């Protein structure tokens, strides 16, 4: 049985920043994550994706962001329990006992759920025989954009992932078609502005009012993508790569059985300190929901700070927290975190 102050479920960017915040407040942390490495979707799904809304970084790729967050958290010696899920919760007086899928037992006064989308997988387009092309010509995630150099690429979707990858790949691809069923994109306005600017150079062709209809190719090698509009008119796009970005399937797994208020795969929290309906359990980042919620990494960072400051008195048996700025605190010697 491990004993700690805080258990953080999820080792994505928000979970890692929560480790740092807890450490700054003198709290010990154990971190549970279902993946084999820390970083969440930033590492597993899109390590080379550029991120534009992190303060002080005009642009930073996801992998580098995780590297910096892990470095920031390292002085506080977090213990990582990777490749395992939190499956059982037992409340005992003023503490919790958590059991993982590897039978790891952890006793903690506070739980911070920073599980992002929970267990995740791509929403796949309903195209005949698409599985024949997967991993060779059809990709749902990008972990090495260099493999797309000189290719003719169809990107499908209208959100941030579709627009950001169209922009990012436009400087190495031969041609990009961005297919979206509407004329309006839901990505960040500045990203849409950049997209339309690049489209004027013909590096990106916007195919709006169309949806994916069929794939054509041989031996797992794509030759063209057929798209169709609302009047059933079709168009053939010569392409050897398809990147469908239609979001992720969300699955809270065992968290859904913990007695938390769950709505549409999200955990309801109060908007002051992000505490759930169970005292001592908080939810932050994309998994948390409240009125006015913004799904930004930056928002998750702020939620981590607020929730852990609120949890201080629970961890330290009612002791009042005397707020200090980080410039007055000593983070101690840097040391390596521990993975279990």
From Swiss-Prot:
Catalytic activity: 2 reduced [2Fe-2S]-[ferredoxin] + NADP(+) + H(+) = 2 oxidized [2Fe-2S]-[ferredoxin] + NADPH
Cofactor(s), by name: FAD
Pfam family, one: Pyr_redox_2
Binding, FAD: 33, 41, 46, 86, 120, 286, 327
Molecular function per GO: ferredoxin-NADP+ reductase activity; flavin adenine dinucleotide binding; NADP binding
Keywords assigned: FAD, Flavoprotein, NADP, Oxidoreductase
EC number: 1.18.1.2
Entry note: cofactor: Binds 1 FAD per subunit.
Family as reported in the entry's similarity comment: Belongs to the ferredoxin--NADP reductase type 2 family.
Subunit: Homodimer.
Name of the protein in question: Ferredoxin--NADP reductase
Origin species: Rickettsia rickettsii (strain Iowa)
């Amino acid at each position: 049985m491990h004993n700690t102050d805080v258990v953080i479920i999820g080792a994505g960017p928000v979970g890692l920043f929560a480790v740092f915040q807890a450490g700054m407040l003198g709290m010990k942390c154990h971190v549970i994550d279902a993946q084999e490495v820390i970083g969440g979707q930033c590492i597993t799904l899109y390590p080379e994706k550029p991120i534009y809304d992190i303060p002080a970084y005009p642009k930073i790729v996801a992998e580098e962001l995780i590297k910096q967050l892990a470095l920031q958290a390292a002085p506080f010696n977090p213990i990582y329990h990777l490749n395992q899920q939190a499956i059982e919760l037992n409340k005992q007086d003023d503490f919790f006992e958590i059991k993982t899928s590897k039978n790891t037992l952890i006793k903690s006064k506070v739980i911070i759920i920073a599980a992002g989308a929970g267990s995740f997988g791509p929403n796949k387009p309903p195209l005949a025989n698409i599985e024949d092309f997967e991993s060779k010509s059809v990709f749902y995630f990008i972990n090495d954009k260099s493999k797309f150099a000189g290719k003719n690429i169809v990107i499908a979707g209208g959100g941030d992932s579709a627009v950001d990858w169209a922009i990012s790949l436009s400087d190495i691809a031969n041609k990009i078609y961005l297919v979206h069923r509407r004329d309006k994109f839901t990505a960040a306005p500045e990203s849409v502005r950049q997209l339309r600017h690049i489209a004027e150079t013909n590096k990106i062709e916007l195919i709006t009012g169309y949806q994916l209809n069929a794939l054509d190719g041989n031996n797992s090698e794509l030759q063209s993508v057929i798209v169709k509009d609302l009047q059933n008119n079709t168009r053939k796009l010569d392409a050897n790569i398809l990147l469908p970005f239609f979001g992720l399937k969300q699955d809270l797994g065992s968290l859904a059985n913990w007695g938390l208020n769950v709505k549409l795969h999200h955990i309801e929290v109060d908007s002051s300190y992000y505490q759930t309906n169970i005292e001592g359990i908080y939810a932050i980042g994309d998994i948390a929901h409240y009125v006015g919620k913004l799904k930004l990494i930056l928002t998750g960072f702020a939620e981590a700070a607020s929730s852990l400051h609120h949890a201080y008195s629970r961890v330290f048996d009612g002791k009042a927290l005397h707020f200090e700025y980080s410039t007055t605190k000593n983070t101690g010697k840097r040391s390596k975190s521990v993975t279990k």
